[in-house]
């Protein structure tokens, strides 16, 4: 079993998946109070730090978990560093090279130097590699790992739907080992010649019908955001698989005639994976986030399911906060498969998957 320190843990999507892969979550660190409360509810045995990572020292971690020190460790240690992705996202139109969040990944270096984790996982949007013409934060961090004699990093851009996640979501991951050979790349499990892609229908068709603004009587997370009377008219005018291009002129705004953002007010397609869920994934005016048939946006429960959170996962905060937590999260199913990949590497390096030699009779 691995021990895990989850920097920038958010609500705990990565930790949930790593836990499902058999790992032990020691600590989560995040600056978002609601997200950290969600993490704590779902990982009650883990320590939590509600502070900016720039204000956290190595000694702070060692005071909470003395066994982190390399000489005292009994199990392999994994650092997960999924730093905020907004500075690198294509959807961030106000990104700036001065955005202080860009430096957050480099903050992990001092923890790596002091504690020498056996494995490191980095997850972000693909744009983290193209922040500027100069060497970006990821390349700088990987150069630092090389200087610390870590193995060659495996850098992959994954399509989450090719790993069983019912959502089109491209993410860059980096997997690094301290000892032995490099970690293997992840192999896709879904798509042409493999298992079928998991669809919106497969994932959310089971949930009860709702009206906009309604909350299910049994499941409080299955609640749909309210919409204005005009937006309700727009939803009623949107056919299955349709969007705002299907409306009559009286329902359109002047901005709707401009190119781009054609997905807003669009319905999800029952028989395809969902579009990428964002921090506003329950708002019909912010993407193709309308229910495939019902005249409402998807509920928080449906959004969580499309991100592969289990039914018993508890969320803290307001509707806006929970939607943000869900949209920011690493899909637990994807994290589980990454965790299993690390575990295979460890077992192979330690001879636990090697065949025993045949004994002579």
What are these regions (language model features)?
Residues 2-116, 126-130, 134-139, 146:
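Core alpha/beta nucleotide-donor-binding catalytic domains of modification enzymes
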Residues 2-5, 9-23, 147, 171-325, ...:
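S-adenosyl-L-methionine-dependent DNA methyltransferase catalytic core
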Residues 50-51, 150-162:
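Conserved S-adenosyl-L-methionine
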Residues 61-64, 156-161, 260-262:
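Short alpha-helical segments and helix-capping/turn motifs at coil-helix boundaries
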Residues 119-125, 156, 316:
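Short beta-strands and strand-loop turn motifs
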Residues 125-130, 322, 326:
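Conserved short loop/turn motifs at secondary-structure junctions
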Residues 164-167:
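Short glycine-biased active-site loop of nucleotidyltransferases that positions the nucleotide triphosphate
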């Amino acid at each position: 079993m691995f021990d895990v320190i989850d920097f920038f843990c958010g609500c705990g999507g990565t930790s949930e998946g790593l836990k499902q892969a058999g790992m032990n979550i020691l600590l989560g660190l995040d600056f978002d109070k609601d997200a950290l409360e969600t993490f704590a509810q779902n990982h009650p045995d883990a320590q939590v730090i509600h502070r900016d990572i720039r204000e956290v020292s190595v000694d702070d971690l060692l005071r909470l978990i003395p066994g982190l020190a390399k000489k005292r460790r009994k199990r392999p240690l994994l650092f997960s560093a999924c730093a905020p992705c907004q500075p690198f996202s294509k959807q961030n139109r106000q990104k700036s090279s001065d955005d202080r969040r860009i430096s957050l990944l480099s903050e992990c270096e001092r923890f790596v130097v002091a504690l020498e984790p056996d494995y490191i996982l980095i997850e972000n949007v693909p744009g983290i590699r193209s922040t500027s013409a100069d060497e970006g934060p990821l390349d700088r961090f990987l150069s630092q790992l090389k200087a610390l004699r870590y193995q060659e990093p495996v850098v992959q851009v994954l399509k989450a739907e090719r790993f069983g996640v019912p959502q089109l979501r491209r993410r860059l991951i980096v997997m690094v080992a301290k000892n032995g050979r490099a970690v293997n790349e992840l192999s896709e499990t879904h798509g042409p010649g493999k298992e079928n892609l998991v669809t919106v229908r497969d994932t959310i068709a089971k949930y009860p019908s709702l009206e906009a603004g309604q909350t299910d009587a049994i499941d409080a997370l299955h609640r749909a955001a309210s919409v204005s009377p005009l937006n309700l008219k727009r939803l009623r005018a949107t056919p299955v698989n349709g969007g705002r291009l299907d409306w009559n002129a009286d329902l359109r705004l002047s901005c709707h005639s401009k190119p781009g953002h054609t997905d807003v007010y669009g319905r999800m397609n029952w028989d395809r994976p969902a579009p990428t869920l964002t921090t506003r994934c329950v708002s019909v005016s912010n993407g193709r986030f309308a229910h495939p048939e019902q005249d409402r946006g998807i509920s928080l429960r449906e959004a969580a399911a499309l991100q592969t959170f289990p039914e018993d996962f508890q969320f803290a905060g307001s509707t806006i906060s929970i939607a943000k937590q869900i949209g920011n999260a690493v899909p637990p199913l994807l994290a589980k498969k990454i965790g299993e990949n690390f575990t295979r590497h460890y077992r192979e390096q330690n001879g636990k998957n090697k065949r025993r030699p045949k004994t002579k009779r």
